[in-house]
Amino acid sequence: MRMNKQIVVTDWIKEKPKLGLFLKLTLSSDERRILRGKRLTDCDQEIILQLPRNGKLNDGDILSTNESNFYVEIIAKTEDLIEISSNSKIELIKTAYHLGNRHVEVEIEEGILLTKSDYVIKNMLLNFKVNVKNTKKKFFPERGAHSHE
């Protein structure tokens, strides 16, 4: 459903309303950091984000709009990633160190590291004592120590 009226997204809602129309907005990990500006929902409805600057959009977030019965649901986009694993915890820690030294975003899961697909990084990883494979998943990188999110 497309509306001709401009929809402005203004804030987060703690609980999903039982009634109302929901627009889905699928965003990459990078796009989920940007809290202001025009976006197209999954059904090509243009919306304007005007959210408070002190946050980050997360998978499943529900956002309120200037239209009382319209809401926006954030969906994390599936992204091309590199999955890194090893039988050796120390090798995985060394790899995390090298990725951090290059300011590469990393998601840390039990026994694996995930980072965005990048041929330079992948070639570097092939020189380490770790297993490297391509995968497609939703990406939730660790927030850095100097993050303002």
UniProtKB/Swiss-Prot annotation:
Keywords: Chaperone, Cytoplasm, Nickel, Nickel insertion
Pfam families in alphabetical order: UreE_C
Subcellular locations according to the entry: Cytoplasm
Gene3D superfamilies, per database record: Urease metallochaperone UreE, N-terminal domain (2.60.260.20), UreE, C-terminal domain (3.30.70.790)
Main subcellular location of this protein, as a coarse class: cytoplasm
Top-level taxonomic group: Bacteria
Entry GO CC: cytoplasm
UniProt-listed GO biological process terms: protein folding; protein-containing complex assembly; urea metabolic process
Gene Ontology MF term list: nickel cation binding; unfolded protein binding
Keyword Chaperone found: yes
Job description of the protein: Involved in urease metallocenter assembly. Binds nickel. Probably functions as a nickel donor during metallocenter assembly.
Family to which this protein belongs: Belongs to the UreE family.
NCBIfam families: PRK13261.2-2
Name of this chain's protein: Urease accessory protein UreE
Species of the source: Prochlorococcus marinus (strain AS9601)
Lineage: Bacteria, Bacillati, Cyanobacteriota, Cyanophyceae, Synechococcales
